[in-house]
């Protein structure tokens, strides 16, 4: 009788698992939206309710006593401290880096990832990063040639913990002792620093944007560039001092977009940081003031608000938008593959379960279509000419210029694109000593050094087509359809140590890199006109000081209140001195 009752309980507890899909598969049916359960004093038992009920009944029927030491080890495990949803979804997931040696290996790996619907995080000429569940690793290796079965290294083996670390929450006592988490000594001191100390959800970003437009109404306007599939507005900040009277020539406009892919949080934070830096320096810096007088700057923090919200509420690593497809359990369209120019989704990305699914026709991705319509309206009816386009993504630290759809088509302004691209990479190197490779988007898997050595050779085919070039990109559409003179896709930090889960202490350093990119971009566009005015562009560049770098684990931070007050005074004195020096140089 006991045995029969136990079997029945096991069957009941297993009903919810009948339709389960392995954690490494991209066709996992999305769970219902509910707030993330962050750490608290509640129980850390990660077992599902039915599992806990089953275990208790079996323990009482068979008289099994609880092993206190076992439960203590689970409670003390760093993995058990992750949010319950992250642990359930990604508890067994890892990120592997495969080292490629030839095109045959790349082709075999690409085919295997397509067959298993794996999530390719990044691809270069030397390696490919892939996320998958541990139980899927044998299946993947079985599809690969012998040379690749040992040619990989674990890149991330604590994915759930790293996901948890990206959320803005107070870490529990003892969690900072884990080697994967390094606290920062320098506390945030100003309003802007406090805002950029953590990643922010859309429910915080939108009111912040309204606040900026209200506080700085002379040169900031909050607009919407469209509406998402789920009905959310796609907010943007327009910076500039366009006069009330009609201008004789179209107003030159630069568009900066982030968050096309929902999980790339650093792109959204970087767009906001760059906008904030320009907003607060207007009227104080001759250089920034000149940029806002000569151009309109439109900053779109997240083109994919539905997907961004979903990464906060359900799945941190969601990439696409939330639009339904022909397969109800595989929603979403890749917004950077959905644009009309050279769209090739029917030929290369026709599977709705693919992370790169481009839809059934051009502009089926609603948010991409909305941005395109807004841009066309700006140029046709709002007396604007979009002269610059910066599309921020992550990760791999690359500055990419057109074309993305093919390496056989050479952009007519190639030399200018390369010249400015190299200048942008140089200013980043001067800012934080980080190296960004510069190449065409179709050769995104070929490093700048390779390109320099083979500049006179025919264009190369990307070694890993799954993560390489493609048609239907926003980059190509703005450059070709709108005749945007300078269009770039910038893949932000890092090179793989954290991937899409870049810790929040790198928000400000990455933001400084792109703020300096924007200054250099504007300086380049101003061109010869700037020679008539004494502008010191270098004085405005933001640099990351040594004390702003993440601290080592042995550092002892000062008490929070004392440190903040002291830092406030130091920052104000430094700002005043720098302004005085700048004014002295101008005179």
Curated annotation (Swiss-Prot):
Domain called Peptidase M14: residue spans: 198-525
Cofactors that this protein relies on: Zn(2+)
Family matches, as InterPro entries: M14A-like_propep, Peptidase_M14
Pfam families per record: Peptidase_M14
Binding site for Zn(2+): 261, 264, 393
Disulphide-bonded residues: 330-353
Family membership noted in the UniProt record: Belongs to the peptidase M14 family.
Annotated protein name in UniProt: Inactive metallocarboxypeptidase ecm14
Organism: Neosartorya fischeri (strain ATCC 1020 / DSM 3700 / CBS 544.65 / FGSC A1164 / JCM 1740 / NRRL 181 / WB 181) (Aspergillus fischerianus)
